[in-house]
Amino acid sequence: MNILVTGIHGFVGSNLVVALKERHSLYGLDIVAPEKEGVVKTFFWKDIEPASFPMRNLPEFDAIIHLAGKAHDTKNRSAAQSYFDINTGLTQKIFDFFLESSAKKFVFFSSVKAAADSVVGDMLTEDVVPAPVGPYGESKIAAENYILDKLKVENGKLK
């Protein structure tokens, strides 16, 4: 499979490359584009902008794994808008790119912070009503909602 991985130079992306490189052709999409062992090519974010780099110049992808994002800032030094620009805005761009592409699979890594800031009891379950606290969690749930709003539901399943 040809797989495009966003955030390929981050912690999860770097480890995912190690796990997938033997069986798949991996491409990266990141804010930096140095060569990386196991990756055919890494593109910059601007490369998926149709006006500056038409999609016909990109390889065809079978799947897109979206890991890129702005991590929560435990020291609270980041401006709130930067979370929305990156976590929500870039997710919108990459999901729209996916919808226009030939890829059949899209995997989005969000965050537990999209659902809750803390867990009452032993675990957080899927039936929790999202109540994010702060711009990090709010930007992640906004990205999730954007994707869900774009999807079709058929016979109770997301398509």
Question: How would you describe each model-predicted region?
Answer:
Residues 45-86, 97-100:
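NAD(P)H-binding glycine-rich loop region in Rossmannoid oxidoreductase-like domains
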Residues 32-40:
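Short loop/helix-cap segments at secondary-structure boundaries that form the rim of catalytic
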Residues 6, 29, 64-68, 106-111:
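SDR active-site strand-loop-helix element
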